[in-house]
Amino acid sequence: LNKLEHSEDEYFEGIKDLKVSCHLLINRTGELLQFVPFDKRAWHAGESAYKGEVNCNDYSIGIELEGNEIDPYTDEQYISLIKVTRELINFYPKVNSQNIVGHSDIAPDRKTDPGKSFDWNRYLSNL
């Protein structure tokens, strides 16, 4: 499993004291970095709720995409995201296109990602 080296990037240094994690990070080149095993809790959602269930960290898989909410995500990121999601759908019966949402859906008062530049149709139609 991977770990962000805070000294490698000024941004990482600024967030080193935050108590957050994700299962996967997909960087701009499409590389997958796993930080937490899928069967363990990652701390990506915070205070959240989905379909009446609270604490989404307890039962969800958190995949982060490197980027911001303005610039489009890369083709490589979509390719990797679609590929890994297909694998998760095959392995976990409860994972399906109807249960895939963004942080903005489960914590709308606090989170805005993946943002307006994320192409949900491109992603979900290719699963």
Q: How would you name each of these model-derived features?
A:
Residues 68-127:
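Basic/polar, cationic surfaces and motifs that engage anionic cell-wall
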Residues 1-94:
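Active-site-adjacent loop/helix surface patches within enzyme catalytic domains
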